């Protein structure tokens, strides 16, 4: 009987040790996962998620949607939200999410070292992952003086030659918000009114539509994000190559504040159930491998290191280093200025 009790005790001990092992941090790492809410829908991103899982064993559960819809969803889910990370485009949207209380502060020496201060929230609530520059694009054979800065687009020589997107477009809102911050509201108002006077047509279409309009001669100059140019440059379609051949690109304000840039970025959510994995994931997206893939796969500028792929052909440029959070802080003011200027 004593031997049987001893055997039973050993069995119970082994069972208890196994149960404790399954509850240990090591076990949670091997079975870890994170829930990502993303407004980016690029094959490049999907490849990164798969690579992250292969390297860490952490499964990425992806929920996709529009930026505003995802923000509203997280707010509606409240403390029970399964979201660990929100990724979205435009610093203004990231600022709005932070103002709504969606994010939590992240203290990461890795992110502090990799992400410049002007490309992250002042309180480390969100971090830039990739960049795009808003450049001036002109038709090479237009015969007009090549503009050197955004303010040049208000000059009378460009009367009826400027094509633009709608004022409600988030990239135009952030551009104007940046101008408000760096030049003041009065100067920003004059700029918006001057550009409206030079419109070749009613604002319409996306950035690619503006590029095609310039190439066709419908207008002579526009502004566009560099990754739209990169897509056309990387295209094998002869029609796209013909468009690119007719276009010239200017990085504005190289003798002054620098060219306006915007970002895609990520923040760890306030009630993230998998906080450690979420921070590890954001750090991974700023790694050399991930940054190179952003550049080569989606024609974006990396936060870390130099550009590669088609957009590298555009050359280096000076960036406006106003903190990207400004785009959100000044957005309401930008809306009012556009409205007063008649920019629809």
PLM features: what roles do these ranges have?
Residues 178, 182-252:
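Ligand-binding pocket segment of bilobal, Venus flytrap-like solute-binding proteins
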Residues 81-86, 104-136, 151, 163-164:
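A structural signal for short loop-to-beta-strand junctions that line the ligand-binding cleft
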Residues 135-142, 261-274, 293:
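A bilobed periplasmic-binding-protein/Venus flytrap-type ligand-binding module shared by bacterial periplasmic
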Residues 37-40, 122, 138-140, 145, ...:
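Short beta-strand->loop
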Residues 32-96:
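Early extracytoplasmic/lumenal segment of secretory-pathway proteins
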Residues 141-148, 180-189, 272-278:
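Short helix-loop capping/hinge motifs at secondary-structure junctions, enriched
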Residues 160-168, 284-307:
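Periplasmic-binding protein-like
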Residues 188, 299-344:
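An extracytoplasmic/periplasmic, membrane-proximal ligand-sensing/linker region
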């Amino acid at each position: 009987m004593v031997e049987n009790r001893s055997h039973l005790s050993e069995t119970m001990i082994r069972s208890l040790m196994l149960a404790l092992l399954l509850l240990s941090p090591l076990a949670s790492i091997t079975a870890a996962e994170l829930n990502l809410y993303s407004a980016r829908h690029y094959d490049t991103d999907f490849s990164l998620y798969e690579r992250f899982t292969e390297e860490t064993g952490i499964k990425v559960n992806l929920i996709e949607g529009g930026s505003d819809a995802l923000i509203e969803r997280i707010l509606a889910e409240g403390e029970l939200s399964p979201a660990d990370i929100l990724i979205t485009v435009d610093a203004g949207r990231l600022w709005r999410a932070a103002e709504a209380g969606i994010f939590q502060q992240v203290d990461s020496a890795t992110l502090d070292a990799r992400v410049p201060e002007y490309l992250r929230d002042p309180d480390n609530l969100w971090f830039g992952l990739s960049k795009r520059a808003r450049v001036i694009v002109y038709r090479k054979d237009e015969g007009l003086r090549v503009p050197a800065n955004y303010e040049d687009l208000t000059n009378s020589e460009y009367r009826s030659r400027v094509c633009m997107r709608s004022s409600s477009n988030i990239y135009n809102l952030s551009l104007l918000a940046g101008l408000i911050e760096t030049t003041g509201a009065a100067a920003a108002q004059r700029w918006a009114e001057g550009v409206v006077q030079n419109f070749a047509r009613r604002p319409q279409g996306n950035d690619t539509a503006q590029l095609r309009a310039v190439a066709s001669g419908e207008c002579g100059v526009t502004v566009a994000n560099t990754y739209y140019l990169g897509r056309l440059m990387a295209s094998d379609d002869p029609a796209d190559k013909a468009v690119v051949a007719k276009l010239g690109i200017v990085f504005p304000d190289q003798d002054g504040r620098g060219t306006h840039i915007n970002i895609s970025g990520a923040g760890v959510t306030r009630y993230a159930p998998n906080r450690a994995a979420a921070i590890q994931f954001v750090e991974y997206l700023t790694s050399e491998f991930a940054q190179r893939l952003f550049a080569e796969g989606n024609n974006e500028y990396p936060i870390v290191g130099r550009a590669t792929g088609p957009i590298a052909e555009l050359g280096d440029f000076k960036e406006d280093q106003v903190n990207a959070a400004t785009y959100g802080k000044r957005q309401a003011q930008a809306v009012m200025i556009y409205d007063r200027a008649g920019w629809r």
